[in-house]
Amino acid sequence: MSASKEIKSFLWTQSLRRELSGYCSNIKLQVVKDAQALLHGLDFSEVSNVQRLMRKERRDDNDLKRLRDLNQAVNNLVELKSTQQKSILRVGTLTSDDLLILAADLEKLKSKVIRTERPLSAGVYMGNLSSQQLDQRRALLNMIGMSGGNQGARAGRDGVVRVWDVKNAELLNNQFGTMPSLTLACLTKQGQVDLNDAVQALTDLGLIYTAKYPNTSDLDRLTQSHPILNMIDTKKSSLNISGYNFSLGAAVKAGACMLDGGNMLETIKVSPQTMDGILKSILKVKKALGMFISDTPGERNPYENILYKICLSGDGWPYIASRTSITGRAWENTVVDLESDGKPQKADSNNSSKSLQSAGFTAGLTYSQLMTLKDAMLQLDPNAKTWMDIEGRPEDPVEIALYQPSSGCYIHFFREPTDLKQFKQDAKYSHGIDVTDLFATQPGLTSAVIDALPRNMVITCQGSDDIRKLLESQGRKDIKLIDIALSKTDSRKYENAVWDQYKDLCHMHTGVVVEKKKRGGKEEITPHCALMDCIMFDAAVSGGLNTSVLRAVLPRDMVFRTSTPRVVL
């Protein structure tokens, strides 16, 4: 990149940072937490194998399978991940002119990406020939004087041409790209340094990135203070590389995440509720600076990069999260609807239960859902020991769980809060739930479940005041409560064992939770989950954890709406 182009590119980046600062967040703790999870759970011998296969000039289906398997292992270990989300862009916050621009730019971006991945220059073949046929083809092309026979694809910065000889090219989608947590973990483990040393090195790199794109000279100077940066290979292309390669781009991205309050684009989180605002802000910068989609195949400029990443998933951290589970490309997962005027459901942008009600959608359970709930509740034994726990306030609960150890049956569901200010406090110091994850919860389920509990039931709990207030607010004074009143330490004795055994039962507690210490300061703790609390309280009383298989009473499509209207953008 020439100096003038680099200056213009960074100007775009800086302007996007300023305009999108409201969507940026401090994610250093979450990135480091994911890196620690990878350090403890990832097979680094397999990481080394994948790094080796990524250096091969030609890679086949077996190599792709190993890459995909390792990517899946990483995805299973980290919390920062993007999820599949189909976005339909309609007139709303975005004007019809905005939609026309987005539609045109997505089409241009599609053409550029396809040309970059499958170049059309003479002698280039990216089809499905076998390795033997490719060798034979190379020899024949050389024989007739076509020098292109020596190349099966575009050479990277290190001069090595690498080809994927696979049957299904779609399996390559979303298997590349770098993750700061993975870069941090690989630097730490394979560089044989302390995690903190890697964090400090990347932080300094990130600080330079606030003022310019770090280059080879910058890296050489930083290496004098941080020898771990010697592992960064500045010749590594950012095209079609795995997240296990030590490219300068991967290190810079990780460094951006180490900064608190840096308004770095890498820290943006997008959701169906914020996507319209993000795209609107991007288009504002595009118009002000004349940003555009380049016709030249190759690396993406800042506008191309952010447009692709935002439109790929629409739910997660577009720059830094694991996207292994996402299928399709940006132009497939975000569709521009130029025909609909969006009038039938000009709902609140947060897509919450209240906005859905105002748009004409049912607030409570339907008759068929009530009948399904009634049948499901028959799985509970009215006379069996039953634990109950809630998160949130009794007048505004956000998570409720009931658990019967004898059968392994449990009821576990969530509710959107009405007091957002109090919710954020509770999230910080107790449950760590992201309010946007509650927008898809089923309204009215709390009242319906409590109403369906057996008459004169006896419920055991750790602390009964809040649960009693909740039950009485729903007219269930007939339910008896037994408060075991254990100390905080005793009640959470089996906390780690419970999370280790049953962590797959709940993925809602994504935030960082801290506890204030008596002598000042704060300490990070495990988020409180109503279901996990029920299980660990029972283990504390029983003197051990029963690792039986647990069974959900409520079907998932009752806990979370699966047929919510598409978001109007």
From Swiss-Prot:
It holds the Pfam family Arena_nucleocap. The lineage of its organism: Viruses, Riboviria, Orthornavirae, Negarnaviricota, Polyploviricotina. Zn(2+) binds at E399, C506, H509, C529. Mn(2+) binds at D389, E391, D533. Encapsidates the genome, protecting it from nucleases. The encapsidated genomic RNA is termed the nucleocapsid (NC). Serves as template for viral transcription and replication. The increased presence of protein N in host cell does not seem to trigger the switch from transcription to replication as observed in other negative strain RNA viruses. It comes from the Viruses. One of its GO terms (biological process) is symbiont-mediated suppression of host cytoplasmic pattern recognition receptor signaling pathway via inhibition of IKBKE activity. The record marks D466 as: Important for exonuclease activity. The N-terminal region is important for the cap-binding activity while the C-terminal region contains the 3'-5' exoribonuclease activity. A CCHE zinc binding site is present in the C-terminal region and may thus contribute to the substrate binding and/or the specificity of the exonuclease activity. This is Nucleoprotein. One of its GO terms (molecular function) is RNA binding. Residues 54-241 are annotated as: Binding site for the cap structure m7GTP. Homomultimerizes to form the nucleocapsid. Binds to viral genomic RNA. Interacts with glycoprotein G2. Interacts with protein Z; this interaction probably directs the encapsidated genome to budding sites. Interacts with protein L; this interaction does not interfere with Z-L interaction. Interacts with host IKBKE (via Protein kinase domain); the interaction inhibits IKBKE kinase activity.
